Amino acid sequence: MIEPASGDTDPLTIDDAARAWVERMRDTMSIEEKVGQLFVFSTSQDSREELAPLPALKPGGINRFPKPDLAAFRDATMFAIESSNVPPIFTGDIEGGTISYPFATAVPNIMGLAACDDLATTEAVARLVARESRVLGYDWSFGPVVDINSAFRSAIVGTRSFGSDPDRVLAQASVYARVLQEEGVAACLKHWPGDGFDERDQHLVTSVNPLSVEEWHELYGRIYGSLIRAGVMTVMSAHIAFPAYIRARMPDAGREAFQPASVSRLLNEELLRGELGFKGLIISDATGMGGLTSWMERSEAVPALIENGCDMFLFSRVPEQDYRLMIDGLRKGLLSEARLEEAITRILSLKARLGLHLREPVERLAPLEQMRAGLQQSADVRKANAASGQSITLVKDVQDLLPLDPIRHRRIVAVMEEGFSFWDGALGRGYDPIIGELTQRGFEVRSYDPDNMPTREDTDLVLYLVGQEATPSAAHIYLDFVKLHGTNRKAMTQFAQEIPTALISFGQPYYLFDAPHMKTSINAYSSIESVQRETARRLVGEAPFTGVSPVDAFCGLEQLKW
């Protein structure tokens, strides 16, 4: 357990013995070893072969995207621990939903938690996530997301956020971050200086926070400031511009006003550290993103990230190349020795704050069967199932369709679009769980056939099941009727006036924008199995809808309400 900070306490404060370890390690490292510590490299294959080249670079951290084989995951992680003379920190995008780790308890995503509208539920889920993360060897969660989902068309914020209400975002994130750190997992606020007002995705372009400085302080400044005072350990500096702040300091700024925060000294050092008082560690967002790669040449970007305020460098397409570019940047003066020393001190202090320097490998990663015993415990599964049910939100039912009845609505045509995940170890996205639950209750469910479209004579209900959660590089998320119905011409056919029709989103909560004619709409936020099963129970009236929408599912349009 990490003791909570208070007031303006440095979240990386450590005792004298830990400080002596930090100073000894820092002062005995070569320049090459210090440069290696700046990097958090990404792995996704759970193999020693994938990890084998990394020890030579001596990275400070390793991000783990696991595959479903727990034994292989453990073996690869232990190999990384045993191959490092400085304990590596293990990181992960631990956000729930369909990117819940395959051998851990699947939990609702962040927006699903917000829809529960119950901080006790958020605390319970965050605690089980943190405990399972520790079982798996994770030390640092890249979360919670504290973006405000103002732009409903944003394909990258949406279900990764706590919603559009800044007060709700702050309340939920405060609980989530506190619990992570109580359980020994460093929390990370993202995406600095704040996403959610631009419809675009920083994975593809340098997106923009368009707020005035005054508006920003009322919203993001309040959120970050409160969580910094509460002792959050780390912040992720994103490839997002904040031109109003830059121009307040540089009135004549042209292109420079749209510089990504990740390489902006003004945003990282003056605003985050100077004005908000953050004393923890700043890590860049993933450096392969278009928001950075479209801004500057790689040889300049690599040292610029550290020189301009980031303490760690996240992900590399070619680790050896970026390592060499960092060394070259130091030799050419693009990265100062002072910034390198400052960054290394914070990196080692974070590791010491988490107690990594005190743990033997077996203390960081238990034997395989002990790991299995610590995952998907029955009490945790019950908590996750309860949260899944609590989150499901009835947006509208103006046709009084619900509850479904196996006599009146026996013949169901399911029109399905599963969506995709950004890594191949994510949970499956099919709809077998909800279809199975309906079938068990006496319904006959058949898949939509574009060559045999449903009619009044053969169909009692058309049920749209869509499920794209907010996802990197998706660009736009919408109801693609061409894909759903099979052809451009058939996309124009809508069934709602002829056959009872309902829309269930197991992803983004804004699909009504593309289908205002849907008279029954449900938002379930993610397609994990427990959410699907709990949705089926609510469809037939076995449990009430209790979810409270964290966003305006009507997208500000009165037309969508009817």
Regions found by a protein language model. Give the residues of each.
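Glycine-rich tight-turn/loop motif centered on a GG-T
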Residues: 60-67, 106-121, 153-172, 201-218, ...
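Active-site-proximal loop/turn and secondary-structure-junction residues that shape catalytic pockets
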Residues: 68, 96, 146-147, 193-195, ...
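Short, conserved phosphate-binding/catalytic loop or strand-edge motifs used
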Residues: 146-156, 322
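Preference for extracellular/luminal or secreted protein segments
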Residues: 1-58, 264-265, 274, 294-562
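Glycine-rich, aromatic-flanked loop segments that form ligand/cofactor-binding clefts
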Residues: 76-106, 122-149, 169-196
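Second-shell residues forming the walls of enzyme active-site clefts
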Residues: 72-83, 98, 164-339, 346
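Hydrophobic faces of well-ordered beta-strands that scaffold small-molecule active sites
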Residues: 35-43, 60-64, 88-96, 140-144, ...
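Short amphipathic alpha-helices and their capping/turn segments at secondary-structure boundaries
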Residues: 74-86, 123, 127-137, 172-182, ...
